Amino acid sequence: MATSSTTPQNLSFVLEGIHQVKFEDRPIPELRDPHDVIVNVKYTGICGSDVHYWEHGAIGHFVVKDPMVLGHESSGVVAKVGSAVTSLKVGDRVAMEPGVPCRRCEPCKAGKYNLCEKMAFAATPPYDGTLAKYYPLPEDFCYKLPENISLQEGALMEPLGVAVHITRQASIKPGESVVVFGAGPVGLLCCAVARAFGASKIIAVDIQKTRLDFAKKYAATAIFEPAKVSAVANADQMREENDLGPGADVVIDASGAEPSVHTGIHVLRPGGTYVQGGMGRNEINFPIMAACTKELTIKGSFRYGSGDYKLAVDLVASGKVNVKDLITGVVEFQEAEQAFKEVKAGKGIKTLIAGVRD
């Protein structure tokens, strides 16, 4: 991996090709709008999408054609403010929402800006990410962190925002039963948000015993490790073990795995709600007969929208959701490539990359 030989001003972690990354000094970003701020990035979490771009150079139709700075799960300190900024000042600690919509299209005006076709999302081609010393954002996409939330925790507002959006899509009511497939960071956070929303039974499902053990200590009320049997058989076993009666009220799939989708549809009660939050293959087989005859409500979930980031911050500030326990490693900026390799190998739950030192 190449490194810059000059004193860096805005050192950035750049993906040039599959498994080809380098540290590159780039210009310090300028304020593009009076309402913008420049953030000195302090911590960035490694997301599965970052690793996927590093591993494959593309996610679906998003293809890395030019060198791209990685990273989008970040927190930092405001370093500069535009002339029209009123809600932030230099020195404020913030969580950084990394996708900026056009604000003018129909989805934006309807409050669903996560569906904006002109979304400029960090580390999604052709837009650079946040693994740099400085990053520009509109002030309203920076969320001031209360004193009881650290900058490390602030970096986890991004995956928590994803989990908040997924869980809000499910419209969970107090006392309901929820099954969450996939005990990675987002699935674990979905369990935590479901608990904060009042779910009485939260069953985490995964094929990795270590993840299930963590889920049980973290936010799940029960865990389930699928056997190598049919989806119907696993669903029946889950219902019986957890006294779900006719089935779960809500299923959240945070895995994207086809067997999870099938089991999730079968474990739901008639009239239940299914939310697909995890992305897997572009196309899978789907149990359409079971979905129709049980008249399920089926929803997708993509990133986060209006109010999700703010709620994420509020949930942590109030103590209703704990994100600190998910942080299993913090590395220096210069160790970013090795950290990507370890995340790819499945080490830890959430690894953070510290910002460039002054």
Swiss-Prot record:
Binds 1 zinc ion per subunit. It is an enzyme of class 1 (oxidoreductase). SMART domains: PKS_ER (SM00829). Its EC number is 1.1.1.9. Pathway: Carbohydrate degradation; L-arabinose degradation via L-arabinitol; D-xylulose 5-phosphate from L-arabinose (fungal route): step 4/5. Zn(2+) binds at residues 47, 72-73. GO terms for molecular function: D-xylulose reductase activity; L-iditol 2-dehydrogenase (NAD+) activity; zinc ion binding. Its cofactor is Zn(2+). Gene3D superfamilies: Medium-chain alcohol dehydrogenases, catalytic domain (3.90.180.10), NAD(P)-binding Rossmann-like Domain (3.40.50.720). It catalyses: xylitol + NAD(+) = D-xylulose + NADH + H(+). Pfam families: ADH_N, ADH_zinc_N. Belongs to the zinc-containing alcohol dehydrogenase family. Xylitol dehydrogenase which catalyzes the conversion of xylitol to D-xylulose. Xylose is a major component of hemicelluloses such as xylan. Most fungi utilize D-xylose via three enzymatic reactions, xylose reductase (XR), xylitol dehydrogenase (XDH), and xylulokinase, to form xylulose 5-phosphate, which enters pentose phosphate pathway. This is Probable D-xylulose reductase A.
